[in-house]
Regions:
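Short, well-ordered loop/turn elements at secondary-structure boundaries
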Residues: 25, 44-47, 56-61, 97-100, ...
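Active-site-proximal segment of RNA-dependent polymerases
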Residues: 73-106, 110, 114-117, 123
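Generic structural signal for residues positioned in beta-strands
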Residues: 1, 48, 92, 103, ...
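Conserved pre-motif C helix in the palm subdomain of viral-like polymerases
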Residues: 60-64, 68-71, 98-103, 109-112, ...
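Hydrophobic (often cysteine-bearing) scaffold residues that line and stabilize catalytic clefts
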Residues: 12-16, 86, 152-155
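Reverse-transcribing Pol proteins
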Residues: 1-82
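Contiguous, well-ordered alpha-helical segments that form the cores/surfaces of helical PPI scaffolds
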Residues: 47-51, 114, 144
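Active-site-adjacent bridging/hinge elements
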Residues: 126-139
Length: 155
């Protein structure tokens, strides 16, 4: 489905390639060499990916990794522990805002892409991709946490 869509729309194809190239340049993903692929590893998972277009941001293409996609009855998120709930309660946050005369808040851009995944755990975050139909399929691996996977002490 993704292949057909990208082959039929060259502009969309270029934007999708650019999104993956950006992740490669930022160090969020790495292309795996052949010798690393040939090593036996029982913990390997390949994530499907697809594109999402936001009607409110017409020039932006986002590629989404699907940690909830099933394969032979299971999916990656089934295997991850969500860990303890570390979020502060909204009531507590609002009460603390009222305690002082100045309040501050911040938003960290793409926070999941800032958290490194332990090297031995990265094999469950692989995906396949080829830039053009003429090229061979390459295997890539995330080295940073992906949005959509359960937060886990494993990462």
């Amino acid at each position: 489905l993704l292949k057909k869509r990208l082959e039929s729309d060259q502009e969309l194809n270029a934007k999708y390639r650019q999104a993956i190239d950006d992740d490669l340049q930022k160090g969020n993903i790495k292309k795996l060499p052949e010798q690393e692929l040939s090593q036996a590893n029982p913990r390997v998972w390949y994530l499907p990916h697809h594109l999402v277009l936001n009607p409110h941001k017409p020039g932006k293409v986002r590629y989404v990794r699907d940690a909830a996609a099933r394969y032979q009855g299971t999916f990656l998120n089934d295997q991850l522990s969500s860990g303890p709930d570390l979020l502060n309660s909204l009531v507590g946050i609002l009460m603390r805002f009222r305690q002082e005369s100045i309040a501050m808040s911040a938003d960290i851009e793409a926070i999941f892409n800032k958290v490194a995944v332990a090297k031995e755990k990265q094999t469950v975050l692989r995906f396949v991709w080829r830039r053009t139909p003429e090229e061979k399929v390459d295997v890539y691996q995330y080295v940073r946490h992906i949005f959509g996977a359960k937060c886990s002490p494993m990462f």
